[in-house]
């Protein structure tokens, strides 16, 4: 039985600080150990792996990133693991670097031979080693299509890894609405990790934004509550941000109905874009722990709720 299997076999809950302490001890032992160079990853240095693990543990995943690859699904999976069990995250990396492969319960992790012989440019060596290991047919960061992760695959990874409460609430064809967004918030408040399935445009910096959303192409992990700033018709200003609730949704739906009626009557004054509600939401993505939803309207403007919903295709919730 591997060290990773032993870590997973315990049924007692592990406190994060204890897991972090164990992770740092594992890193220290590995750095002083006899393995100085991996025969499986000849171009990845032990120092880069050790430094990468330390950065991820001490910053709780801040630097765990996909670079220019399409490995957002694997990044979301391993970020979820890292933030609750950093000791398991570290043990996986050590096992893969030392032995070329490992298992996490029923999840087999081994990179393709081409991936093992590659020195990545657009992402850290430790991230390439780990993220490519869950995609056995993935050879290079530039291979965008092979790096794509569909909801069913991400769900299976979590189940195979031992997460016992995994629910898929996504849609590949049409975007989701307010009710699904409220469910995501409620699940987040209940302690679930929420992997949002979105059009990446809603998290892109303003200068890289495109137009309308036609399909989901990105996974991110929620790192904040979903908050809404309602527009006050009387004061002509937005109200303070509040966590999304059913009453807020009911108010928004009424507002949408009123706007649609005004549009039908060609009353331009009543369909002013300034009445659009705003959404505030941060998520882990692209190696950064907290990236906010931003609008395509202005680089300094909070994102319109309607803009976010246009690129929101649901979520997967997980809990160990």
Give a label for each model feature.
Residues 121-182:
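Core alpha/beta structural scaffold of self-assembling particle/tube/pore-forming proteins
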Residues 7-141, 185-197, 291-294, 303, ...:
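Active-site nucleophile-adjacent alpha helix/oxyanion-hole segment immediately C-terminal to the catalytic cysteine
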Residues 2-6:
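Short, compositionally biased, intrinsically disordered N-terminal export/targeting signals
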Residues 173-266:
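Active-site-adjacent substructure of cysteine-protease-like catalytic cores
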Residues 227-320:
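Noncatalytic regulatory segments and standalone regulatory/sensor domains
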Residues 15-19, 23, 49, 154, ...:
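Extended hydrophobic/Leu-rich segments
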Residues 135-143, 197-205, 226, 285-288:
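Short, flexible beta-strand-to-coil junctions
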